[in-house]
Amino acid sequence: MVMTDPIADFLTRIRNANQAKHEVLEVPASNIKKGIATILKNEGFVKNVEFIEDDKQGIIRVFLKYGPNGEKVITNLKRVSKPGLRVYSKREDIPKVLNGLGIAIISTSEGLLTDKQARQKNVGGEVIAYVW
């Protein structure tokens, strides 16, 4: 069966592993998934990310992060722009997630950026997902 939205599948796997309190998650790799995983690591939503090369497309290993009492660092992930309904944002209209407590992941001409980085670089693009 052909997967129509691999980004939504990646976010759903993270959400499900987070709900089940798993420590490690492995998903098939792609460039955009690597970019999203790197942003999640840089913003402190996950502990670590490893990129494993194999003879196929590779694997991304995501180490999920929890608080001292087991509380989830990632409250929710929401896919915004979907294959059936693309959502674009001009540089002036870049959304803030929970008044800056969360992040928006945006695909721009500069690559994958958070909403803060896109505002600093003054670029707009496709709003991939919200994370809070």
UniProtKB/Swiss-Prot annotation:
It comes from the Bacteria. Keywords: Ribonucleoprotein, Ribosomal protein, RNA-binding, rRNA-binding. PROSITE patterns: RIBOSOMAL_S8. GO terms for biological process: translation. GO terms for cellular component: ribonucleoprotein complex; ribosome. Disulfide bonds: none annotated. One of its GO terms (molecular function) is rRNA binding. Belongs to the universal ribosomal protein uS8 family. One of the primary rRNA binding proteins, it binds directly to 16S rRNA central domain where it helps coordinate assembly of the platform of the 30S subunit. NCBIfam families: PRK00136.1 (NF001109). Part of the 30S ribosomal subunit. Contacts proteins S5 and S12. This is Small ribosomal subunit protein uS8. It comes from Streptococcus suis (strain 05ZYH33). The gene is rpsH.
